[in-house]
Amino acid sequence: MTYDLTDDGTGKKYDSGKSMVGTLCRVFPRALLGIGKCITFGTKKYPNPKNWSLVEDGLNRYTDSLMRHLLKMFAGQEVDPETNLPHIFHVCWNALAIAEFYLMKHKEIDEELFK
């Protein structure tokens, strides 16, 4: 990669091709707030915010949880009775947990994300 070092009086930011994480907040603010409510409920139930990552056989158990919430949603139950939150937020939270477990297992992909 080469950089243009000339000063033309305009600001430059060489971030082409890098992850646009901030865009998530602008594009999906309500969905992220809903997922955040799931996290808030979880930290009240399990005080250690990293508890989810310590669960034995977490990948399979969170996959099962995702599927349970998805099936309940498709069966017509929109809101989880325990949390009073829509099942779709739990589906998304579980998908994020599954993605993290995947990255823990595949360190080469994890390292590539942070380049």
Where on the chain are the PLM-derived regions?
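Intrinsically disordered, low-complexity regulatory regions
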Residues: 1-115
